[in-house]
A protein has these predicted regions:
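Short N-terminal "domain-start" leader segments
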Residues: 1-22, 83, 87-101
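Short aromatic-glycine-(Arg/Gly/Cys) micro-motifs in beta-strand/loop hairpins
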Residues: 16-40, 75, 98-117
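A short, exposed loop/beta-hairpin motif centered on an aromatic-Gly-Thr core
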Residues: 34-50, 122-128
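A short, charged, amphipathic alpha-helix used as a generic interaction element across diverse proteins
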Residues: 46-63, 135-143
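Short, conserved charged micro-motifs
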Residues: 50, 88-91, 130-137
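Surface-exposed beta-loop interaction hotspot
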Residues: 55-96
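Conserved short beta-strand edge segments in small beta-sheet-based binding/regulatory domains
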Residues: 68-70, 144-161
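Short, intrinsically disordered low-complexity segments
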Residues: 108-141
Length: 166
């Protein structure tokens, strides 16, 4: 997946594209960061190797319009901890990861990097652009499930001091 951002006067816009081999199409997801974006598909009848070239040309067009690639420095860590869960329940772990990935991804605000159970409970590390909006979105997504109770969201300062966000 290719992910690009463009800074507006008051907000960031996102543009994401990837090739779906099975369907022989490009999926494109666009919108304002922090707001549910729109998605559309572009059909293609080209061979797979030409699809990468076509995607690169598309990326070049978007960059000419002011979009830039997302770097690790653009993303802030958001930790989502469930004290009452552990990694033994693999299905639950993957379900929560999917919920986090979906709620952050559909708003162009980030993604979930997976879970860790070394700190007590189960902790998911997400990488986000706008941490305040991500907290709102994650809390809302979890509120709609049975996983909301007992969740804690936090991040770290550059000096490794912990900041509790909920």
């Amino acid at each position: 997946m290719i992910r690009l951002l463009k800074k507006g006067e008051k907000e960031w816009w996102f543009w994401e594209a990837w090739y779906e081999e099975k369907e022989a199409l490009y999926a494109v997801h666009v919108g304002t960061v922090g707001v549910k974006g729109g998605q559309y598909s572009v059909l293609t009848d080209q061979a797979a190797e030409n699809n990468l070239q076509a995607l690169q040309e598309w990326i070049n067009e978007m960059k000419a319009e002011g979009y830039v690639g997302v770097t690790t420095e653009d993303l802030q860590p958001l930790h989502v901890q469930f004290f009452h869960l552990d990694a033994e329940d693999v299905e639950t772990r993957y379900l929560i990861e999917q919920i986090l990935d979906e709620c952050l991804g559909m708003t162009g605000n980030g993604h979930c990097d997976g879970g860790d159970d070394s700190r007590g409970g189960l902790v998911f590390i997400c990488r986000v652009l706008q941490i305040d909006q991500a907290v709102v979105d994650v809390r809302q997504a979890l509120r709609e499930t049975s996983f909301f109770e007992g969740v804690s969201l936090f991040t770290f300062h550059s000096d490794n001091s912990c900041i509790i966000l909920t």
